[in-house]
C-alpha cells in the first residue's frame, strides 16, 4: 500500500510558535467579530458559533475588502478596489427571503454595506448581496444571489404551511412580523430599519452556503495566513505557493481519516487557540520523546460537493522544510498511527488522489459493494433473514473477518452500527460528528452536507451544530444516536497499562452511545436545541388483550409520556369492536411514536396504526426481553430506585401513588400487579425499556410525575340515573376523533393546518404552557354546570378590569416555557444521571458553551417566576371583587388565603438571587456559590484559609527560631511552602527536622514534617473545593428542583389564568353579539338546545365578503309554539351548497364553547349539559384502512347508535348517499327512527331524501327545517332558473334540492344538465305513480274511504 494511504503521513511535525507569533496569530484571529447568522443571538450554535469557538470550517472564497477599510484594531488594512457591481434583480430597500447553510429561509432587507457603500459583490461567477436579517438583534451578511427570493408577506402561499418558506419557529415568525411591517413602507422608510452597522471580522462575514467547497479545521497559523492572503490580489497559483511557504503543516489531498478515523480529542486550555488541535491518541510519554515541541494534529479532509460541480485544485507540493519535519517523526509514533491506516485495497488506491469532480467520485460507494450488507443477503445479529418472523431490523450481522480487517476506529463504528442499524450514528471524532457509509448518504441528502473525498461515503459537521442537524433528521422521521468519546488518551494509556495483553483494538479511546433521539423522545437539552412548537408530542406504549373469543371486546393497557415535560399517563380500559376509546385517546394525545408488543396487536388496532397514525414512528418490541410484563416492570422500577429522591420522605413501597394503586393490596413490597392493572403496567414496561435504550430513563422517571388515564366516557356508561353524571366535578364532554376532525377543532380538512379551526380562532394565549392547557380544555369541555358557570364568572370578572389585564398580558409575554425549563433543570441536577450516565464521562469540546446555556436557562426560569409574582401582585389588588372561585384560587397566595393555590415564592427567589453572581455565571459558564449557600464549598474554603494562616504562623516561628527575617516560602503545586533560607544562615546549626529539598545560588530550600502535614491538609481542602465547585451547578439545580411542587403549582396557576384571559379576550372581542351561555341541569328540565341569532365562531365573513347570516337552532325547546315543539330530532333539508353542513358544525362548535366556559357568538344560548357530541359529516373513504365511503358512514353511524344517550348531541349529514338510493333511504329512515323515538337525543339530521321527509312529516318526535333560498324564473328548464341562497334556517321542508343549480355552478356542460333534468322528471313521475298505486291499494282495503283519502288520491293524479 502506498505510504500516502497511512494516517501518519498527514501529521508532520511543526515547530511550536513563539510567544510573539502566538500573540500575533491570536490578535489576527480575535481582531474582529464574525457576522452572526440569523437567529444566532438567542441560541448559540451553527455556523456562526464555529467562529466563536475558534477557527473552524470557513468558505474558501473570500471577498475583497474595500480600500482603506478599518479593522477592529483601529488600523488600516491593505485592500483592493471592489469590482464593478454586476446586474442584480434586487436593489437597496427590497425585502427578500435569504437562505444560509443550516438555517431556514429568513426574511431580510437589502441595503448598502455600511463601509463599502455597495450592496453587491462579485467574485468570479459568484454574486453576493448584502442584507440585514430581521431578528431580535439584527445582524447582517453577504448572501449568494441565487439564494435570495422576493418577500411577498407572511400571508403568501409559500410562507404558509406546505409552502417553500414555511417555518413554525418563533424567531422566524417574529422576523416575518417585522418584515410585514416593513412591507407596508416605501423603500426609503425601509432603509431606516438598517441599523446593523458594526464592523465584522475582516470581511469574513460571507457565511458558508450549500454546495460550497471548503477546507475544515484551520489552525491559528492558517487563519493568520489567510487573513493576509485575503487582501492580496494574487493569482491562484501564487496564493497557493505563498500559503505553502507560510504553512507549518502540510495538508495532503489523500484521505486522512476514512480508514483510520480514530483521532482523539482532549480539551486543553493550553491549546485552546486552535480549533483543530486534537490529540492523536499518542500518550504523553510518547510526545515527550519527540525531537522538538510538536503538536500532532489531524487535518480535516477537503470536502467536495455532492454533485461534484467544483473542480479539484492541483495537489500541493511539500516544501523541503516540511518534508524534513515529516520524516523526523519517531518510529514509535509511526507505529501508533499505523493503527489508524486505511485498508489496503485497489479501490482505496484508486480514489486516494481523486478530486471533487464527478469523474473522481466512485460510482458505487464502498459499503454498497459489501455482499453481506445487500438487502437480499442481510441478516440480523442472530443471523435471521428479513423473511423470518422474528427478524430484528434494528440489528445487523457483521462478519467477524470483516471486523478484523477494519481499523480500530472503524471497527468500533461497525460494532455500534450492528446493534443500532436503524439509527443514524453521529460518531464523535475530535470536535466533529462524523457520518459514515449509509449514514453519510442520509447526511448529504437530508442535511445538505458534503462528501469528503474517497471511496467511502463520509461527511460530518462540528459539535456545536449537533442540535440543529439532529433535530432536522428527527423531524424527518430518522432516529439519531450521539456517540461520544468517553475517555482521554491519558485515561486510555492508564487502562492499557493495567491490562495483561494489549491488542491494537485496546489502544483506542472508548466511545459510547450517550443519547438516542427520536420524535417521541426529544427532551430539548442544551445539545438538542429548542422546540419548534409549543404543543406536546407523545411517546405511546400500547398493550392489547382480547377479552372474548369473538373479538367484539378488547382491553388496552396504555402508557404515554411527553418527554419534554417528564409527565407520564398510564391506564387500562375495555373497548368495543370499533376501538372507540382507543381512537379517542390518540386524538386527544396524538403520539408521534408508538411502541407495541410484537405479534400481539389485533387486526383492528393495526388498522388504526396504519391509517390514523400513519405519520407516527411505529416500533414493535420483543415480548419479555423488550416489552416487559407487569411483574418485571415493577421489579425494575424498585431495583433501579428511580423514585428515591422524590419519595425519600415516603413510607412503604417506593413508588408514586398512581403506580402504588396499581399493585396488589396483599403485596406489601409492591412487586405484584393489581388484577385490573397488568396491561397498564406492561405498557409502562415497554415505555421504560425504550427510554432506557434512549438513555433518558433516569432523568424522566426520577421526576415521579405520573397521572392515571381514565377514558372520558367511563362514567357515562355506568351511570343509570338520568343527569347524575353532571353533578360530578371531573366529568367531561366526550369528543372522539371523528368529531374533532369533522368539527375542525384542531386541524382543518383542507390542508391539515390550524387555519380556520376553533383552536386558531380562540387561542390568544401568551405562554406555551397556557396554549397546552387550552388544547386540553378544548379536548374535554366541562359537564358540571357549577364548574362551567364558575369559568364564565371568571371571564366576566376579567372583562371588568381591562387596565389590570393589559398589565398582566404584557408580563405574560415575557414568560419562557417554564414547564419545560423545570424539566431541563431537573435533568441537569439529577444525581442519578451524574453518577453512571455515559454523558457524565463524555469529552465535550464546547462544554463552556453548554454550561452557559444551562445557566441562561436557569436564570431565565428565575426571572420567569419573578414575573409570575408580579402578575399575582397585580391581580391581588382587584381579587376581592371577583365572583369566580377558580380565578380567586389561582391568583391568591397560599399564605394569605386558605383557598389560594399560588405558592409564596418570595423567600426562595431571594435565596437564589444571593446564591451566586448571576452576571458572572452568565458570562463565564461557571457558578461560584456565595458564602452560606453551599455548606461543602464553604467548609472547604474555611479549611483552606485555616491551613494557609497556620502555614504563615509557622513561617513566622521559623524566622524567629533561625533569626532571619528574609526566610520566605517557595514552590508551586505540591512542592509549595519550601522554606527558602539564605546560604549564610544554613552554615549555622539548623534543626534536625529540616529536610533539604532543592538549592539555588545563594540559598537552600527545606521542608519539615509539620509543613508536609499542613500542606497535605491544604491540598485536601483545595481538592474538596475543586470537586465541590465542579459539581456546583448540578447540586445547585438539584437544590432548586427540591421545590419542584411549588414551582409546578405556580406554573399551573398562571396557565389557568392565561387560558381564562384568552377566553375573556375572545368573549370581549367577538364579531357581533356575544352572550353568556345558560346551563340548566337535566333534573330541572328535559334535554334541549336553544341557539338564537347564532353564528359560526370561525367564519365571520363569507368568501364573497358578505356578513355571516345568524340562525336560530332550536331542539326540544318547550317555548316553541307548535305541536311538535319538543321534538328531539330535526330533519334539515335545503338546496345543495345552501349551508346545511355549516349549520350543523355551528351547533356542535357552540355547544363545545359553551361547556368550555366561554361566551358564544349568539344572542341567546341555553342548553342542558351535553355528555358527548357525535358527528357523521362529509363523505370520504379510508384507503389505508381498506374502508369504502359507505362503510365509513355506517361505522360512524354504528358508533352513534351504540354510545349515544339522551344527553348527547348528534349531527348526521346526508347518511346513505354512499350506496343505492333505496338502500340509503331505508337505512336513513331506520336511523332517524332509532334516534328520535328510542334514544331521544338532540339530533340534527340533514338529508336530500324527500321521501324521508314525507314519512316523518307527521311524526311528533321529528321536526322539519330547511335552509331557505329564493328561486327566480322557476320553470321546466333549469338553465332559466336563478337560485339565491339565503343561508337562513327556517321551519318546514324544502321542496327540492336544486342539484342542477350546483351542476351549473360547477360548469357542467349544458347538454348534460338538460339530459339530467329530463331523466329526473321521468324518475319523479315514476315515483308518483308508485305512490298513487300504493294509496289506491290501501284505500281499497278499507271498508270506508274518508274525504281526506279521496283528496290525497286526486292530488297525486293531478301531479301526474
Swiss-Prot record:
<dbReference type="GO" id="GO:0006281">
    <property type="term" value="P:DNA repair"/>
</dbReference>
<dbReference type="Pfam" id="PF05190">
    <property type="entry name" value="MutS_IV"/>
</dbReference>
<comment type="subunit">
    <text>(Microbial infection) Interacts with herpes simplex virus 1 protein UL12.</text>
</comment>
<dbReference type="InterPro" id="IPR027417">
    <property type="entry name" value="P-loop_NTPase"/>
</dbReference>
<feature type="modified residue" description="Phosphoserine">
    <location>
        <position position="137"/>
    </location>
</feature>
<dbReference type="GO" id="GO:0005634">
    <property type="term" value="C:nucleus"/>
</dbReference>
<feature type="modified residue" description="Phosphoserine">
    <location>
        <position position="275"/>
    </location>
</feature>
<feature type="modified residue" description="Phosphoserine">
    <location>
        <position position="43"/>
    </location>
</feature>
<dbReference type="GO" id="GO:0140003">
    <property type="term" value="F:histone H3K36me3 reader activity"/>
</dbReference>
<dbReference type="GO" id="GO:0045910">
    <property type="term" value="P:negative regulation of DNA recombination"/>
</dbReference>
<dbReference type="GO" id="GO:0045190">
    <property type="term" value="P:isotype switching"/>
</dbReference>
<feature type="compositionally biased region" description="Low complexity">
    <location>
        <begin position="33"/>
        <end position="51"/>
    </location>
</feature>
<dbReference type="InterPro" id="IPR007861">
    <property type="entry name" value="DNA_mismatch_repair_MutS_clamp"/>
</dbReference>
<feature type="region of interest" description="Disordered">
    <location>
        <begin position="1"/>
        <end position="84"/>
    </location>
</feature>
<dbReference type="GO" id="GO:0000710">
    <property type="term" value="P:meiotic mismatch repair"/>
</dbReference>
<keyword id="KW-0597">Phosphoprotein</keyword>
<dbReference type="GO" id="GO:0007283">
    <property type="term" value="P:spermatogenesis"/>
</dbReference>
<keyword id="KW-0067">ATP-binding</keyword>
<feature type="modified residue" description="Phosphothreonine">
    <location>
        <position position="488"/>
    </location>
</feature>
<feature type="compositionally biased region" description="Basic residues">
    <location>
        <begin position="240"/>
        <end position="249"/>
    </location>
</feature>
<feature type="modified residue" description="Phosphoserine">
    <location>
        <position position="274"/>
    </location>
</feature>
<feature type="modified residue" description="Phosphoserine">
    <location>
        <position position="280"/>
    </location>
</feature>
<dbReference type="GO" id="GO:0016446">
    <property type="term" value="P:somatic hypermutation of immunoglobulin genes"/>
</dbReference>
<keyword id="KW-0547">Nucleotide-binding</keyword>
<keyword id="KW-0225">Disease variant</keyword>
<feature type="modified residue" description="Phosphoserine">
    <location>
        <position position="79"/>
    </location>
</feature>
<dbReference type="GO" id="GO:0008340">
    <property type="term" value="P:determination of adult lifespan"/>
</dbReference>
<dbReference type="Pfam" id="PF01624">
    <property type="entry name" value="MutS_I"/>
</dbReference>
<dbReference type="GO" id="GO:0005794">
    <property type="term" value="C:Golgi apparatus"/>
</dbReference>
<keyword id="KW-0238">DNA-binding</keyword>
<dbReference type="GO" id="GO:0016447">
    <property type="term" value="P:somatic recombination of immunoglobulin gene segments"/>
</dbReference>
<feature type="modified residue" description="Phosphoserine">
    <location>
        <position position="14"/>
    </location>
</feature>
<dbReference type="InterPro" id="IPR000432">
    <property type="entry name" value="DNA_mismatch_repair_MutS_C"/>
</dbReference>
<dbReference type="InterPro" id="IPR007696">
    <property type="entry name" value="DNA_mismatch_repair_MutS_core"/>
</dbReference>
<dbReference type="Pfam" id="PF00488">
    <property type="entry name" value="MutS_V"/>
</dbReference>
<feature type="modified residue" description="Phosphoserine">
    <location>
        <position position="254"/>
    </location>
</feature>
<dbReference type="GO" id="GO:0009411">
    <property type="term" value="P:response to UV"/>
</dbReference>
<dbReference type="InterPro" id="IPR007860">
    <property type="entry name" value="DNA_mmatch_repair_MutS_con_dom"/>
</dbReference>
<feature type="modified residue" description="Phosphoserine">
    <location>
        <position position="261"/>
    </location>
</feature>
<keyword id="KW-0227">DNA damage</keyword>
<feature type="modified residue" description="Phosphoserine">
    <location>
        <position position="41"/>
    </location>
</feature>
<dbReference type="GO" id="GO:0097193">
    <property type="term" value="P:intrinsic apoptotic signaling pathway"/>
</dbReference>
Amino acid at each position: 500500500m502506498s505510504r500516502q494511504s497511512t494516517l501518519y503521513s498527514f501529521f508532520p511535525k511543526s515547530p511550536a510558535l513563539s510567544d510573539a507569533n502566538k500573540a500575533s496569530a491570536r490578535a489576527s484571529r480575535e481582531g474582529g467579530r464574525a457576522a452572526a447568522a440569523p437567529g444566532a443571538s438567542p441560541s448559540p450554535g451553527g455556523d456562526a458559533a464555529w467562529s466563536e469557538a475558534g477557527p473552524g470550517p470557513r468558505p474558501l472564497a473570500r471577498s475583497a475588502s474595500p480600500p482603506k477599510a478599518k479593522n477592529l484594531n483601529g488600523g488600516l488594512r491593505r485592500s483592493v478596489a471592489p469590482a464593478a457591481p454586476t446586474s442584480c434583480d434586487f436593489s437597496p430597500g427590497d425585502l427578500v427571503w435569504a437562505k444560509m447553510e443550516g438555517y431556514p429561509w429568513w426574511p431580510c432587507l437589502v441595503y448598502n454595506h455600511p463601509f463599502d457603500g455597495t450592496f453587491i459583490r462579485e467574485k468570479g461567477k459568484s454574486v453576493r448581496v448584502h442584507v440585514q436579517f430581521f431578528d431580535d438583534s439584527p445582524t447582517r451578511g453577504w448572501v449568494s444571489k441565487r439564494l435570495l427570493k422576493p418577500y411577498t408577506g407572511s400571508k403568501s402561499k409559500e410562507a404558509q404551511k406546505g409552502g417553500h418558506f414555511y417555518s413554525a419557529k418563533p424567531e422566524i415568525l417574529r422576523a416575518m412580523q417585522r418584515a410585514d411591517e416593513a412591507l407596508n413602507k416605501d423603500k426609503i422608510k425601509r432603509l431606516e430599519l438598517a441599523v446593523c452597522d458594526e464592523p465584522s471580522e475582516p470581511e469574513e462575514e460571507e457565511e458558508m452556503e450549500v454546495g460550497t467547497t471548503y477546507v475544515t479545521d484551520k489552525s491559528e497559523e492558517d487563519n493568520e495566513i489567510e487573513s493576509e492572503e485575503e487582501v492580496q490580489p494574487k493569482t491562484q497559483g501564487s496564493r497557493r505557493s505563498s500559503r505553502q511557504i507560510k504553512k507549518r503543516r502540510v495538508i495532503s489531498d489523500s484521505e486522512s481519516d476514512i480508514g483510520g478515523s480514530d483521532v482523539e480529542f482532549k480539551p486543553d486550555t493550553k491549546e485552546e487557540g486552535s480549533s483543530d488541535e486534537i490529540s492523536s491518541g499518542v500518550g504523553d510519554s510518547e510526545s515527550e520523546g519527540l525531537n522538538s515541541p510538536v503538536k500532532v494534529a489531524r487535518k480535516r479532509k477537503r470536502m467536495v460537493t455532492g454533485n461534484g460541480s467544483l473542480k479539484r485544485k492541483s495537489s500541493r507540493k511539500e516544501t523541503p522544510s516540511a518534508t524534513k519535519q515529516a520524516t523526523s517523526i519517531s518510529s514509535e509514533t509511526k507505529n501508533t498511527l499505523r493503527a489508524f491506516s486505511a485498508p489496503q485495497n485497489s479501490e482505496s488506491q484508486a480514489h486516494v488522489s481523486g478530486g471533487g469532480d464527478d469523474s473522481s467520485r466512485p460510482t458505487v460507494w464502498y459499503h454498497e459493494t459489501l455482499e453481506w450488507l445487500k438487502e437480499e443477503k442481510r441478516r440480523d445479529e442472530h443471523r435471521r433473514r428479513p423473511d423470518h418472523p422474528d427478524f430484528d431490523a434494528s440489528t445487523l450481522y457483521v462478519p467477524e473477518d470483516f471486523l478484523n480487517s477494519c481499523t480500530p476506529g472503524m471497527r468500533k463504528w461497525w460494532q455500534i452500527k450492528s446493534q443500532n442499524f436503524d439509527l443514524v450514528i453521529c460518531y464523535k471524532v475530535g470536535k466533529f460528528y462524523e457520518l459514515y457509509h449509509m449514514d453519510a448518504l442520509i447526511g448529504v441528502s437530508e442535511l445538505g452536507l458534503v462528501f469528503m473525498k474517497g471511496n467511502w461515503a463520509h461527511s460530518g459537521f462540528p459539535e456545536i451544530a449537533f442540535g440543529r442537524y439532529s433535530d432536522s433528521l428527527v423531524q424527518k422521521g430518522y432516529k439519531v444516536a450521539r456517540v461520544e468519546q468517553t475517555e482521554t488518551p491519558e485515561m486510555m494509556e492508564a487502562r492499557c497499562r493495567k491490562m495483561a495483553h494489549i491488542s491494537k483494538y485496546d489502544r483506542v479511546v472508548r466511545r459510547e452511545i450517550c443519547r438516542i433521539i427520536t420524535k417521541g423522545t426529544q427532551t430539548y437539552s442544551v445539545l438538542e436545541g429548542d422546540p419548534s412548537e409549543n404543543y406536546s408530542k407523545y411517546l405511546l406504549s400500547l398493550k392489547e388483550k382480547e377479552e372474548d373469543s369473538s373479538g367484539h371486546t378488547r382491553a388496552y393497557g396504555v402508557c404515554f409520556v411527553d418527554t419534554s415535560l417528564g409527565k407520564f399517563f398510564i391506564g387500562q380500559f375495555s373497548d368495543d369492536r370499533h376501538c372507540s376509546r382507543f381512537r379517542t385517546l390518540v386524538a386527544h394525545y396524538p403520539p408521534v411514536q408508538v411502541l407495541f408488543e410484537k405479534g400481539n396487536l389485533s387486526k383492528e388496532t393495526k388498522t388504526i396504526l396504519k391509517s390514523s397514525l400513519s405519520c407516527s414512528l411505529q416500533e414493535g418490541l420483543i415480548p419479555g426481553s423488550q416489552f416487559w410484563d407487569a411483574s418485571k416492570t415493577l421489579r425494575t422500577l424498585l431495583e433501579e430506585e428511580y423514585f428515591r429522591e422524590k419519595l425519600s420522605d415516603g413510607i412503604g413501597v417506593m413508588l408514586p401513588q398512581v403506580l402504588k394503586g396499581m399493585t396488589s393490596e396483599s403485596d406489601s413490597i409492591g412487586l405484584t400487579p393489581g388484577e385490573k392493572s397488568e396491561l397498564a403496567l406492561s405498557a409502562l414496561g415497554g415505555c421504560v425499556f425504550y427510554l432506557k435504550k434512549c438513555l433518558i430513563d433516569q432523568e424522566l422517571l426520577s421526576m415521579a410525575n405520573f397521572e392515571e388515564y381514565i377514558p372520558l366516557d367511563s362514567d357515562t356508561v355506568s351511570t343509570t340515573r338520568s343527569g347524575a353524571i353532571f353533578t360530578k366535578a371531573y366529568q367531561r364532554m366526550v369528543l372522539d376523533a371523528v368529531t374533532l376532525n369533522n368539527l375542525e377543532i384542531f386541524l382543518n380538512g383542507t390542508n391539515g393546518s390550524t387555519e380556520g379551526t376553533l383552536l386558531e380562532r380562540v387561542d390568544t394565549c401568551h405562554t406555551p404552557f397556557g396554549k397546552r392547557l387550552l388544547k386540553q380544555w378544548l379536548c374535554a369541555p366541562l359537564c358540571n354546570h357549577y364548574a362551567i358557570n364558575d369559568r364564565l364568572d371568571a371571564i366576566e370578572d376579567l372583562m371588568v378590569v381591562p387596565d389590570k389585564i393589559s398589565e398582566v398580558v404584557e408580563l405574560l409575554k415575557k414568560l419562557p416555557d417554564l414547564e419545560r425549563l423545570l424539566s431541563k433543570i431537573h435533568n441537569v441536577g439529577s444525581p442519578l444521571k451524574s453518577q453512571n450516565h455515559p454523558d457524565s464521562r463524555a469529552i465535550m469540546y464546547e462544554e463552556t458553551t453548554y454550561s452557559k446555556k444551562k445557566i441562561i436557562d436557569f436564570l431565565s426560569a428565575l426571572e420567569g417566576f419573578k414575573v409570575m409574582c408580579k402578575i399575582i401582585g397585580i391581580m391581588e389588588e382587584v381579587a376581592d371583587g371577583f365572583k369566580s372561585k377558580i380565578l380567586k384560587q389561582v391568583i391568591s397566595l397560599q399564605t394569605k388565603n386558605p383557598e389560594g393555590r399560588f405558592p409564596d415564592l418570595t423567600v426562595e427567589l431571594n435565596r437564589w438571587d444571593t446564591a451566586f453572581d448571576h452576571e458572572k455565571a452568565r458570562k463565564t459558564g461557571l457558578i461560584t456559590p456565595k458564602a452560606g449557600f453551599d455548606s461543602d464549598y464553604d467548609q472547604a474554603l474555611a479549611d483552606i484559609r485555616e491551613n494557609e494562616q497556620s502555614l504563615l504562623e509557622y513561617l513566622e516561628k521559623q524566622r524567629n527560631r533561625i533569626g532571619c527575617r528574609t526566610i520566605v516560602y517557595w514552590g508551586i503545586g505540591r512542592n509549595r511552602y519550601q522554606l527558602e533560607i539564605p546560604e549564610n544562615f544554613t552554615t549555622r546549626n539548623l534543626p534536625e527536622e529540616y529536610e533539604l529539598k532543592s538549592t539555588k545560588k545563594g540559598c537552600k530550600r527545606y521542608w519539615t514534617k509539620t509543613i508536609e502535614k499542613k500542606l497535605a491538609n491544604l491540598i485536601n481542602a483545595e481538592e474538596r473545593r475543586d470537586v465541590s465547585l465542579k459539581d456546583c451547578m448540578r447540586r445547585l439545580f438539584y437544590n432548586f428542583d427540591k421545590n419542584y411542587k411549588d414551582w409546578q403549582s405556580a406554573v399551573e396557576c398562571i396557565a389557568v389564568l392565561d387560558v381564562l384571559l384568552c377566553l375573556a379576550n375572545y368573549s370581549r372581542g367577538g364579531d357581533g353579539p356575544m352572550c353568556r351561555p345558560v346551563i340548566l341541569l337535566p333534573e330541572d328540565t328535559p334535554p334541549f338546545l336553544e341557539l338564537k341569532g347564532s353564528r359560526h365562531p370561525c367564519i365571520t365573513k363569507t368568501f364573497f365578503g358578505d356578513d355571516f347570516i345568524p340562525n336560530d337552532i332550536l331542539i326540544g325547546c318547550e317555548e316553541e309554539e307548535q305541536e311538535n315543539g319538543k321534538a328531539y330530532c330535526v330533519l334539515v333539508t335545503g338546496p345543495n351548497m345552501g349551508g346545511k353542513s355549516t349549520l350543523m358544525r355551528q351547533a356542535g362548535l357552540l355547544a363545545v364553547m359553551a361547556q368550555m366556559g366561554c361566551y358564544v357568538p349568539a344572542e341567546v344560548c341555553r342548553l342542558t349539559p351535553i355528555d358527548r357530541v357525535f358527528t357523521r359529516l362529509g363523505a370520504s373513504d379510508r384507503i389505508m384502512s381498506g374502508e369504502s365511503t359507505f362503510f365509513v358512514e355506517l361505522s360512524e353511524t354504528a358508533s352513534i347508535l351504540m354510545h349515544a344517550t339522551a344527553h348527547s348531541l348528534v349531527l348526521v349529514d346526508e347518511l346513505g348517499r354512499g350506496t343505492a338510493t333505496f338502500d340509503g333511504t331505508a337505512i336513513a329512515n331506520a336511523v332517524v327512527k332509532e334516534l328520535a323515538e328510542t334514544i331521544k337525543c338532540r339530533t340534527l339530521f340533514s338529508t336530500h331524501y324527500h321521501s324521508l321527509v314525507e314519512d316523518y312529516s307527521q311524526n311528533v318526535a321529528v321536526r322539519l327545517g330547511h335552509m331557505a333560498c329564493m328561486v327566480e324564473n322557476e320553470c321546466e328548464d333549469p338553465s332559466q332558473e336563478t337560485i339565491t341562497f339565503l343561508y337562513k334556517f327556517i321551519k318546514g321542508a324544502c321542496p327540492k334540492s336544486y342539484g342542477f343549480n350546483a351542476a351549473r355552478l360547477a360548469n357542467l356542460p349544458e347538454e348534460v344538465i338538460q339530459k339530467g333534468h329530463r331523466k329526473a322528471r321521468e324518475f319523479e313521475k315514476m315515483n308518483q305513480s308508485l305512490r298513487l298505486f300504493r294509496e289506491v291499494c290501501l284505500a281499497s282495503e278499507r271498508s270506508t274511504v274518508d274525504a281526506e283519502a279521496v283528496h290525497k288520491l286526486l292530488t297525486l293524479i293531478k301531479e301526474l
